[in-house]
């Protein structure tokens, strides 16, 4: 059994960011941002995420930052489209265009313990 400071559970999101100037595609989600930040701060973490296997390349963000993770398959991947209405990005419309299968207790690895279990959900129903 392995022990971690934190186990972070949440969906990786394939984000589409639309501004008056351009369209960007990026990988986001609470699990990504918190895991990368905590890893660089020296925390012993494990990220647990779900996505459709066809979108597995999204996990490269964890590899680039040395974040250990477990990947669970889902029929869908979370995806959010943020449309910013002004160049200063003060106003936006946020649309969920995909959501992973809901997380359950069965998704928490039984061979891992942690001081803190962080549930990094992005939307109701995850």
What are these regions (language model features)?
Residues 123-126:
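An aromatic- and histidine-rich active-site surface loop
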Residues 9, 120-121:
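Short, well-ordered coil/turn residues at beta-beta hairpins
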Residues 8-12, 33-36, 107:
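Short amphipathic alpha-helical segments, especially helix-boundary/capping motifs
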Residues 14-25, 40-120:
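Conserved N-terminal subdomain of the carbohydrate kinase-like
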Residues 23-36:
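Short catalytic helix/loop segments, enriched in acidic residues and glycine
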Residues 1-19:
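Positively charged, low-complexity intrinsically disordered leader regions
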């Amino acid at each position: 059994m392995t022990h971690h400071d934190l186990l972070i559970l949440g969906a990786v999101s394939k984000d589409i960011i639309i501004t008056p100037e351009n369209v960007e595609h990026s990988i986001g989600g609470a699990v990504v941002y918190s895991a990368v930040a905590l890893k660089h701060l020296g925390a012993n973490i494990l990220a647990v995420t779900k996505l459709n296997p066809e979108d597995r390349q999204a996990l490269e963000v964890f590899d680039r930052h040395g974040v250990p993770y477990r990947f669970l398959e889902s029929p869908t991947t979370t995806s959010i489209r943020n449309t910013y209405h002004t160049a200063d990005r003060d106003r936006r419309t946020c649309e969920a265009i995909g959501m992973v299968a809901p997380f359950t207790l069965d998704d928490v690895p039984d061979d891992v313990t942690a001081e803190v279990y962080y549930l990094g959900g992005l939307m109701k129903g995850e």
